[in-house]
């Protein structure tokens, strides 16, 4: 499965310079570290996130993450699962309470190397490290009820694409990640209409 993922990332066309450089970094770690799918790798490990949109693709689910003290996309650690799409769907279901989630495409929607500062989790010190993140475009019905995952989030909701950017307190995400995801969503929808 790891080789399949490497091939998929090799074929991925970067959207911008950030993705171009991050693609190289992710491939380097995948090729050179056997434990890259486990958070026991204290330098870097694979994570999967999603841009979870509604049926009309004009709203996205954002959760207020306790750890980051900010609204953020949904996602999590691969923890040994070498299929990041499955991880993104699983995490989206766990964090939102939604069960009707589907992938709009099985392809990688976006990729990023995310710097994580040292922090305390479950009363344990976690050193600074990198998340080698693959993002997937997922969809759910916005009339179905959302449910807070209390051990991770304190609020969750559907937000307009612009609101999703503005409610985040994480500057790097507000400037570099969420606007990029919205731009890519717009291009994806235009391509799908052709």
Q: Where are these predicted regions, by residue range?
A:
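Acidic, metal-coordinating catalytic segment for phosphate/diphosphate chemistry
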Residues: 11-49
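Unchanged
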Residues: 79-172
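Generic secondary-structure boundary/loop-capping signal
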Residues: 34, 43, 68, 75, ...
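Charged phosphate-binding loop/patch that engages nucleotide di/tri-phosphates or the phosphate backbone
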Residues: 169-194
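Generic N-terminal amphipathic, Lys/Arg-enriched alpha-helix
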Residues: 1-13
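N-terminal strand-loop-strand
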Residues: 38-73
């Amino acid at each position: 499965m790891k080789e399949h993922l490497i091939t998929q990332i090799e074929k991925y066309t970067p959207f911008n310079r950030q993705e171009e450089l991050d693609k190289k970094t992710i491939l380097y770690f995948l090729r050179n570290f056997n434990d890259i799918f486990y958070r026991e790798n204290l330098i870097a490990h694979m994570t999967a996130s999603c841009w979870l949109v509604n049926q009309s693709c004009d709203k996205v689910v954002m959760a207020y993450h306790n750890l980051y003290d900010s609204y953020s996309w949904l996602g999590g650690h691969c923890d040994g699962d070498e299929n990041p799409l499955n991880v993104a769907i699983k995490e989206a279901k766990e964090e939102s309470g939604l069960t009707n989630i589907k992938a709009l495409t099985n392809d990688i929607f976006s990729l990023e190397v995310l710097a994580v500062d040292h922090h305390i989790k479950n009363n344990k010190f976690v050193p600074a490290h990198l998340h080698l993140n693959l993002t997937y475009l997922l969809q759910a019905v916005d009339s179905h009820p959302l449910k807070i995952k209390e051990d991770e989030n304190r609020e969750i909701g559907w937000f307009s694409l612009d609101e999703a950017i503005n409610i985040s307190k994480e500057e790097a995400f507000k400037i570099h990640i969420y606007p990029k995801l919205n731009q890519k969503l717009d291009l994806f929808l235009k391509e799908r209409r052709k």
